Swiss-Prot record:
Influenza RNA polymerase is composed of three subunits: PB1, PB2 and PA. Interacts (via N-terminus) with PB1 (via C-terminus). Interacts with nucleoprotein NP (via N-terminus). Interacts (via N-terminus) with host MAVS (via N-terminus); this interaction inhibits host innate immune response. Gene3D superfamilies: Polymerase Basic Protein 2, C-terminal domain. GO terms for biological process: 7-methylguanosine mRNA capping; cap snatching; DNA-templated transcription; symbiont-mediated suppression of host cytoplasmic pattern recognition receptor signaling pathway via inhibition of MAVS activity; symbiont-mediated suppression of host gene expression; symbiont-mediated suppression of host mRNA transcription via inhibition of RNA polymerase II activity; viral RNA genome replication. It is found in: Virion; Host nucleus; Host mitochondrion. This is Polymerase basic protein 2. The gene is PB2. GO terms for cellular component: host cell mitochondrion; host cell nucleus; virion component. The keyword Ribonucleoprotein does not apply. InterPro entries: Flu_PB2_2nd, Flu_PB2_6th, Flu_PB2_C, Flu_PB2_CAP-bd, Flu_PB2_middle, Flu_PB2_N, INV_PB2, PB2_helical. It comes from the Viruses. The lineage of its organism: Viruses, Riboviria, Orthornavirae, Negarnaviricota, Polyploviricotina.
Length: 759
């Protein structure tokens, strides 16, 4: 108050006022501060001061021909004095108003195209719904978020090339448009912006918004997709939040969401196959998301999620250096440790071999619904400050931190045996064993942890073993805070390696990610995901496996047929038959396989028993490792529709039905494609007779006597010719080969020759 009185007193003296208003600022340092560099030092003052002038704007001389000197009210719009230091005219803000009302109207067709991102935003806001405002403490954490809805995912360099090509096509400079998305966008934009009068620089700026992902590190409580971030200032303050439902989705958010779902499905599936890494790569390369190849999206999309990062690592791309455990992203902020193998005993006296981290370290832990700061020493939790949306989320974070600390009291809290397995039925590593155990039930863990008296600290409370808050007591070293912990802000990416079991390590050998860390959450993708790989057939259930397996055989029948007769071992090992095995009851799989393989061998050995439909029908069963047994089957069981259904070895069934007249195959009533049997094999099986060591010479030749039946052929000597009756009474001339030539050429040419001979 005293100061203010003193100031008022000073201001009332005219001398003070005079000094302040009339004195020139001639101190060199001040002049330097406000005049050096292009950056405006006090923009709001500059704006106010400029607008107080009569002519704050300068314009090209041509303005004098296009805008009158005075408006209807007689106010001067521009000055006859030219601007000091340039040959431009000084203009009043009133000229802008005049121009807006009376200036020429141009064609507006390009505006929605150039300013697409703005028009789209208006639409989203128009159709969005704003709900009530709630006043409550906001736990915000800084996360790296996408602030630019509706963009493609080009790199800055790729976008630059596209923009140059679209906006300045005649500029000199090498531009290489390689990726599919670059070419498509360039073509589309050139088309849209033909004869566009909007300033090229503006067009370039707006194109950049459409092509490149822009991210900022912002405090967020709630949705992090770009359509929520664009209204962040409307939906959350320091102590309030407003409910909001966006009025429309944007492709970039859909891509991010669908990519995560595809990656999770692929990692889960790869983990249970014989060679997880090879399978994962095969699936990533053969999958499309919203019509774009998944590998292209992975190269461009910066989404950080466990499954996505495993796929990136497999492709040799760099990923973030933080590591994942129990669904939380850990980032070491200080300290260091060395690893040592140690054997520990659980409360059930089971021995576990764990890799102990020796040394003091500090970490930030960031999860979907909780965040924490963890300080730990060798096998000891020093302090955990956790914050989360609700009791459940906070408990999850505490369990993960307790297990991660490797404390003895945690290991001793194990009751019962640890024998958790992953999807491939392999035992989990000890740390994940412990994690799974306590995620199921943490009661003993919390009870045994220990309790301590606490000092009251602003914004922090204690938490008891039953998860109730307390200001007096807390579980040892653990506090709940109102403030969230920021996500790791750096976008630095590191080179990593991946082993065949999909464990991702940094260059010091620390495991950053493994399939155990991939979330089991199921979601529905917003863009269509097309998995072309046979390994993903089972994602839509047993029926899809059945239909896809048979469709694959039919599509590839020509090659399958040759392999069937020449080199069945390779055929039986095809990965396309792998999913089918899960449909065959485990106990009988081996017997079925042995039975079918024997049957096929007889078909190969006995002339005239080749039967396309039967081979296709039974082939998938032969892929399992065979058990030798004398058992004969008239039908084989597959588990679909929740129960065992039968496939008849000879004849049709609801599962596998071949209609001879229409040549259509239906699986469980679903059309599985057209199956062309080889000419009339069903009646005589000539194909196998002819294939095995006979050459078809052409039409019947009477000089070689009456037509023999297929069974009589075996009596011919090498090089001898004879007429043979095939199928529907057609007769062809054949010769028994002089040498046992390759069946391959026989099987390829026989069918064609029979057809030619008959026709």
């Amino acid at each position: 108050m005293e100061r203010i009185k003193e100031l008022r007193n000073l201001m009332s003296q005219s001398r003070t006022r005079e000094i302040l208003t009339k004195t020139t600022v001639d101190h060199m340092a001040i002049i330097k501060k406000y005049t050096s560099g292009r950056q405006e030092k006090n923009p709001s003052l500059r704006m106010k001061w400029m607008m107080a002038m009569k002519y704050p704007i300068t314009a090209d001389k041509r303005i004098t021909e296009m805008v009158p000197e005075r408006n209807e009210q007689g106010q001067t719009l521009w000055s006859k004095m030219s601007d000091a230091g340039s040959d431009r005219v000084m203009v009043s803000p009133l000229a802008v108003t005049w121009w807006n009302r009376n200036g020429p109207v141009t064609n507006t067709v390009h505006y929605p195209k150039v300013y697409k991102t703005y028009f789209d935003k208006v639409e989203r806001l128009k159709h969005g719904t704003f709900g009530p405002v709630h006043f409550r403490n906001q736990v915000k954490i800084r996360r790296r978020v996408d602030i630019n809805p509706g963009h493609a995912d080009l790199s800055a360099k790729e976008a630059q090339d596209v923009i140059m090509e679209v906006v300045f096509p005649n500029e000199v400079g090498a531009r290489i448009l390689t990726s599919e998305s670059q070419l498509t966008i360039t073509k589309e934009k050139k088309e849209e912006l033909r004869d566009c009068k909007i300033s090229p620089l503006m067009v370039a700026y707006m194109l950049e918004r459409e092509l490149v992902r822009k991210t900022r590190f912002l405090p967020v409580a709630g949705g992090t997709s770009s359509i929520y971030i664009e209204v962040l200032h409307l939906t959350q303050g320091t102590c309030w939040e407003q409910m909001y439902t966006p009025g429309g989705e944007v492709r970039n958010d859909d891509v991010d969401q669908s990519l995560i779902i595809a990656a999770r499905n692929i990692v889960r599936r790869a983990a249970v196959s014989a060679d997880p890494l090879a399978s994962l790569l095969e699936m990533c390369h053969s999958t499309q998301i919203g019509g774009t190849r998944m590998v292209d999206i992975l190269r461009q999309n910066p989404t950080e999620e466990q499954a996505v990062d495993i796929c990136k690592a497999a492709m040799g791309l760099r990923i973030s250096s933080s590591f994942s455990f129990g669904g939380f992203t850990f980032k070491r902020t200080s300290g260091s440790s060395v690893k040592r193998e140690e054997e520990v005993l659980t409360g059930n006296l089971q021995t576990l071999k764990i890799r102990v981290h020796e040394g003091y370290e500090e970490f930030t832990m960031v999860g979907k619904r909780a965040t924490a700061i963890l300080r730990k020493a060798t096998r000891r939790l020093v302090q955990l400050i956790v914050s989360g949306r609700d009791e459940q989320s906070i408990a999850e974070a505490i369990i993960v931190a307790m297990v991660f600390s490797q404390e003895d009291c945690m290991i001793k809290a194990v009751r019962g045996d640890l024998n958790f397995v992953n999807r491939a039925n392999q035992r989990l590593n000890p740390m994940h064993q412990l994690l799974r155990h306590f995620q199921k039930d943490a009661k003993v863990l919390f009870q045994n942890w220990g309790i301590e008296h606490i000092d009251s600290v602003m914004g922090m409370v204690g938490v008891l073993p039953d998860m109730t808050p307390s200001t007096e007591m807390s579980m040892r070293g653990i506090r709940v805070s109102k403030m969230g912990v920021d996500e790791y802000s750096s976008t630095e990416r590191v080179v990593v390696s991946i082993d065949r079991f999909l464990r991702v390590r940094d260059q010091r050998g620390n495991v950053l990610l493994s399939p155990e860390e991939v979330s089991e959450t199921q979601g529905t993708e917003r863009l269509t995901i097309t998995y072309s790989s046979s390994m993903m057939w089972e994602i839509n259930g047993p029926e899809s496996v059945l239909v896809n397996t048979y469709q694959w055989v039919i599509r590839n029948w020509e090659t399958v047929k040759i392999q069937w007769s020449q080199n069945p071992a390779i055929l039986y090992n095809k990965m396309e038959f792998e999913p089918f095995q899960s449909l065959v009851p485990k106990a009988i799989r081996g017997q079925y396989s042995g039975f079918v393989r024997t049957l096929f061998q007889q078909m190969r050995d006995v002339l005239g028993t080749f039967d396309t439909t039967q081979i296709i029908k039974l082939l998938p069963f032969a892929a399992a490792p065979p058990k030798q047994s004398r058992m004969q089957f008239s039908s084989l069981t597959v588990n679909v529709r929740g129960s065992g259904m039968r496939i008849l070895v000879r004849g049709n069934s609801p599962v596998f039905n071949y209609n001879k007249t229409t040549k259509r195959l239906t699986i469980l009533g679903k059309d599985a494609g057209t199956l062309i049997e080889d000419p009339d094999e069903s009646t005589s099986g000539v194909e196998s007779a002819v294939l095995r060591g006979f050459l078809i010479l052409g039409k019947e030749d009477r000089r070689y006597g009456p037509a023999l039946s297929i069974n009589e052929l075996s009596n011919l000597a090498k090089g001898e010719k004879a007429n043979v009756l095939i199928g529907q009474g057609d007769v062809v001339l054949v010769m028994k080969r002089k040498r046992d030539s390759s069946i391959l050429t026989d099987s390829q040419t026989a069918t064609k020759r029979i057809r030619m001979a008959i026709n």
